[in-house]
Amino acid sequence: MKVLILAAGLGKRMKSKYPKVVHKILGKPMINWVVDLGKAFGEVGVVVGHKADIVKSYLPEDVKTYLQEPQLGTGHAVMCARDFISENEDLLVLYGDVPLLSKETINKLKKEHEEQKNQVTVLTFVTDNPAGYGRIIRENGKVRIVEDKDATEEEKKIKEVNSGIYIFSGKFVLENLDKLSNNNAQGEYYLTDLVGMAERSSTVILEDIVEVSGVNDRIQLAQLETIAKQRILEKLMLSGVTIVDPNSTFIGPDVEIGMDTIIYPFTIIEGYTKIGEDCEVGPYSHIVDSNIGNEVKVIRSEVEKSVIENKVSVGPFSRLREGTVLKEKVKIGNFVETKKTTVGKNSKAQHLTYLGDATIGEDVNVGAGTITCNYDGYKKYPTYIGDGAFIGSNSSLVAPVNIGKGAITGAGSVITEDVPNDALALGRARQIIKEGWAKKKREELKNADHKE
């Protein structure tokens, strides 16, 4: 089956300079929710129009795009993607601003379509307030759709309405697409007219109409985010994850969390993040696109595009940036920042430290205030710290530099040269003591004050 997503609309009511379909729900653009759904069923194509280049920038490379310019209705959108349609495959039509449709619903639609050997199968729903929706009319075993403005008084009483989601026979679409007419008040080509041409058609009635709820403004965007968040959190809790306060916790649709992990309030977990079992995350933590092992603590910290192995402690107030890898039992503490850095097993940097472009061995102690000076204004340089090294507090390691295994740097040192294994490196001025100098200085200052 091929999947065609219609995403060319302007979205005026969003009041935005960005296309409607790139606005996010739980950190993920709506169009990507729909693309991921579509990929579960086959090759995906997207019809773009308004600010097409922006929409394209959000799409995976393997998704084909088709330009609809100008936008002359849903039927016209499918016409613009004629080259995508195959007469040997069915065509599922979805919408870029309908993000909560489920695989289960599409499977039901697909099953009905295949079992009945339909030319078109329509996803419908029943509502007590059908105003504005196309009504479903059944005649002689066929289905047609009457738009609200064209419905008779009797037809307006019908409560089963069109969701806009269809599966077509590709052959049927190619044979009948050119028969669509724009002879209507809007001067547009409607996909609903194609439904009426089918000799073999039926419907699947959707029970949960939230699945086909679209987004037209930011109020509806917020409403769908609330619903999506609730469903994701409930699924996690039913799988063995403790969410202390669901109202203040935000977890994206592509996040995986293991059982017996506890998520504390005011935590945001987004992107393709995987968290293992028996972890504690939060409060006030933000994790994006990261892989976290078992028995890990992330407290009041930021983690982005990082890998954290088992039994690691992060925070409070740590920032792990892209390319960070923390091996087992590492401790990263207060106000420590890392980027493109690997920290070996059992090593720790617990206070006021920056580690960038660094490779740190096992059992290393990085003292408070340590900085890897990795940038000269033009280029980044690496720092290597061997197993068992001890980096004294307030050390500045000027890269490129290699600290050997078991080496020690004295507190307050500026290290500009490689340090051999098991050596002590001191890069600071020698301390000078002048006996009685402070007392003498105070007396001088006191006498000067009296003279004034």
From Swiss-Prot:
Mg(2+) binds at D97, N216. It holds the Pfam family Hexapep_GlmU. Residues 1-218 are annotated as: Pyrophosphorylase. Pathway: Nucleotide-sugar biosynthesis; UDP-N-acetyl-alpha-D-glucosamine biosynthesis; N-acetyl-alpha-D-glucosamine 1-phosphate from alpha-D-glucosamine 6-phosphate (route II): step 2/2; Nucleotide-sugar biosynthesis; UDP-N-acetyl-alpha-D-glucosamine biosynthesis; UDP-N-acetyl-alpha-D-glucosamine from N-acetyl-alpha-D-glucosamine 1-phosphate: step 1/1; Bacterial outer membrane biogenesis; LPS lipid A biosynthesis. GO terms for biological process: cell morphogenesis; cell wall organization; lipid A biosynthetic process; peptidoglycan biosynthetic process; regulation of cell shape; UDP-N-acetylglucosamine biosynthetic process. Transmembrane segments: none annotated. It catalyses: alpha-D-glucosamine 1-phosphate + acetyl-CoA = N-acetyl-alpha-D-glucosamine 1-phosphate + CoA + H(+); N-acetyl-alpha-D-glucosamine 1-phosphate + UTP + H(+) = UDP-N-acetyl-alpha-D-glucosamine + diphosphate. Residues 240-452 are annotated as: N-acetyltransferase. It is found in: Cytoplasm. Keywords: Acyltransferase, Cell shape, Cell wall biogenesis/degradation, Cytoplasm, Magnesium, Metal-binding, Multifunctional enzyme, Nucleotidyltransferase, Peptidoglycan synthesis, Repeat, Transferase. Its EC number is 2.7.7.23, 2.3.1.157. InterPro entries: Bifunctional_GlmU, GlmU-like, GlmU/GlgC-like_hexapep, GlmU_C_LbH, Hexapep, MobA-like_NTP_Trfase, Nucleotide-diphossugar_trans, Trimer_LpxA-like_sf. Its cofactor is Mg(2+). Signal peptide: none annotated. UDP-N-acetyl-alpha-D-glucosamine binds at residues 6-9, 20, 68, 73-74, 95-97, 134, 147, 162, 216, 321, 339, 354, 365. The keyword Glycosyltransferase does not apply. Binds 1 Mg(2+) ion per subunit. HAMAP family: GlmU (MF_01631). Homotrimer. Catalyzes the last two sequential reactions in the de novo biosynthetic pathway for UDP-N-acetylglucosamine (UDP-GlcNAc). The C-terminal domain catalyzes the transfer of acetyl group from acetyl coenzyme A to glucosamine-1-phosphate (GlcN-1-P) to produce N-acetylglucosamine-1-phosphate (GlcNAc-1-P), which is converted into UDP-GlcNAc by the transfer of uridine 5-monophosphate (from uridine 5-triphosphate), a reaction catalyzed by the N-terminal domain. This is Bifunctional protein GlmU. It comes from Fervidobacterium nodosum (strain ATCC 35602 / DSM 5306 / Rt17-B1).
